């Protein structure tokens, strides 16, 4: 656990904001057909309509998670107390921890190679920020 304590909140915040930006961009490229939808979701998607539903849900969830981190960084003003923001970050930590395990069992090597590492970084960074007892400056 010492590593987590030396992992700065500012670095964790920069990591999550960068990764989430890239994830949003990636899913948008899947939606518009630049990246073939057959290589995502463990190759389980069978139609463009199915892909669009999955991608819209993913983009919505990612945007909500992005917003939580923006609130933690005080880049978005909110009425939510810090305790609620931190609770939401613990939920994000659990989500990305489970997501990391799910990706490891997915069907495609591309997902395993790239997204396992990114998901693990998100879990690690979420953990670090959830432990932080104050809002975090990203600068």
Where are these regions (language model features)?
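Membrane-embedded alpha-helical segments of multi-pass transporters/permeases
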Residues: 67-70, 104, 127
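Interfacial loop at the N-terminal end of multi-pass membrane proteins
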Residues: 2-13, 29-54
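Membrane-helix boundary connector in multi-pass membrane proteins
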Residues: 98-114
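Alpha-helical transmembrane segments of integral membrane proteins, especially early/N-terminal helices
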Residues: 11-26, 120-122
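Membrane-water interface at the C-terminal end of transmembrane alpha helices
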Residues: 121-139
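Loop-to-transmembrane helix junctions at the membrane interface
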Residues: 75-89
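Hydrophobic alpha-helical membrane segments
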Residues: 86-102
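Core segments of alpha-helical transmembrane spans in multipass integral membrane proteins
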Residues: 22, 29-31, 46-74, 90-94
């Amino acid at each position: 656990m010492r590593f987590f304590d030396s992992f700065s909140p500012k670095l964790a915040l920069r990591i999550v904001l960068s990764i989430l930006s890239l994830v949003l961009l990636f899913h948008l490229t899947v939606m518009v057909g630049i990246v073939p939808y057959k290589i995502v979701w463990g190759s389980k998607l069978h139609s463009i309509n199915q892909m669009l539903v999955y991608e819209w849900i993913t983009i919505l969830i990612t945007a909500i998670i992005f917003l939580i981190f923006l609130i933690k960084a005080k880049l978005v003003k909110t009425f939510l107390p810090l305790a609620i923001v931190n609770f939401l970050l613990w939920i994000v930590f659990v989500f990305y921890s489970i997501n990391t395990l799910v990706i490891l069992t997915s069907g495609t090597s591309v997902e395993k190679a790239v997204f396992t590492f990114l998901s693990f970084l998100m879990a690690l960074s979420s953990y670090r920020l959830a432990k932080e007892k104050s809002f975090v400056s990203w600068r």
